[in-house]
Amino acid sequence: MQTVIKNGTVYQNGRLIHADVLIEDQKIKAIGTDLTGDKVIDATGKLVSPGLVDVHVHYRDPGQTYKEDIETGSKAAAHGGFTTVGAMPNVTPVPDTPDLMKKMVQENKQKGIVHIFQYGPITKNETTDELPDYAALKKAGAFALSNDGHGVQTAQTMYLAMQEAKKNDLIVAAHAQDDSLFNHGIVNEGEKAKELNLPPVTELAETTQIARDLLLAEKTGVHYHICHVSTKTSVELVRMAKACGINVTCEAAPHHLLLTEDDIPKDNGYYKMNPPLRSKEDQAALLVGLLDGTIDLIATDHAPHAKQEKQGGMQNAAFGITGSETAFSTLYTKFVKEDKVFTLEQLLSWLSDQPAKVFGLKKAGVLEPGCPADVAIFDLEHETELKEKDYQSKGINTPFTGQKIYGATVMTMVDGEVVYQRGEK
């Protein structure tokens, strides 16, 4: 059967064109005008995009499925227009052996409704200085390496890890955090920490480890990717490293682009995340970094928690914010429609073809004949409200609930099959 998406504004190769999209046998067959098919999806007045790509999600499965599981996490991704995600390995048990990795990859495929690529850990159990067998993990299905949630504390361990990752052509995606400098902090070091009387987090906890790792990456030649950069100095370090030819890429998270420490209204656990919300100066540097290419992509760091884990104030709340279901609409509303900081084409690139390109996910994040029919359709014209009852994730820990947005997802397709449709649970 052939399905045609008619009369949409299609994002293709960095451009927006008025076109139809023809789907057959789970793939894009053609993009053009006056196309016909057995089934017609009317996209008049809608944006037709490649399925978005999020290289940074936490699905808590196995080990903490009361927070999220593969099924609900992938449903949340589809609700946000994402059809390809990278799942972090900070689950229980950590997939640090070939058998555990194979099981994770199999579970992702069986339970997920989107394409889920699985990270392996940089170190065994994410908390030791012992390296797993990277070659075996890659053979079992690991697409990259990360200890996200933990910084690699020992320089020698990271140096050895980068050498082995380079040998096995694996990306090292780092959560840059020096625990001795983080020092159990909660809020960015500044006036807000003083106002709330909460332990501060110095930006040095992030920047010193980035500086260290950039030197190690230069020495080893590994592809070093930095997760959720959040400070002006981090951006400056990456900019200098790229100018020196170091093989480094990095991502920014939607919440660090949209919010600052000044937006924390009170001691509210929904605003507790790691890295913390930073200053307006840091936020401005992130936006400049995206626009000048220093920051390569946007990734959500979708980190769901049970409701009770985010209550009782920031001191006791868990770190983390959800993002899969709110990323595109909140970023589009703020930076494209209202403030006109980005173009729609730029935003779509940072959320689709760029993350796919950085991580070597061939045929993801693009609409081209022969590619999988992974498609997202968005409504840019009508205002809606973000409501808890509409979330597909088990986690509702986002401060964006109640916000009026444009860019709600109308439909998401994976391999030509509808996996999300607005109005249907």
From Swiss-Prot:
GO biological process annotation, one example: 'de novo' UMP biosynthetic process
Positions of the catalytic residues: D301
Entry similarity comment: Belongs to the metallo-dependent hydrolases superfamily. DHOase family. Class I DHOase subfamily.
Native source organism of the sequence: Lactobacillus helveticus (strain DPC 4571)
Keywords of the record: Hydrolase, Metal-binding, Pyrimidine biosynthesis, Zinc
Pathway noted in the entry: Pyrimidine metabolism; UMP biosynthesis via de novo pathway; (S)-dihydroorotate from bicarbonate: step 3/3
Reactions catalysed: (S)-dihydroorotate + H2O = N-carbamoyl-L-aspartate + H(+)
Family matches, as PROSITE patterns: DIHYDROOROTASE_2
A Gene Ontology term for the protein's cellular component: cytoplasm
Protein name in the entry: Dihydroorotase
Protein residues bound to Zn(2+) 1: H56, H58, D148, D301
Lineage: Bacteria, Bacillati, Bacillota, Bacilli, Lactobacillales
Cofactor annotation comment: Binds 2 Zn(2+) ions per subunit.
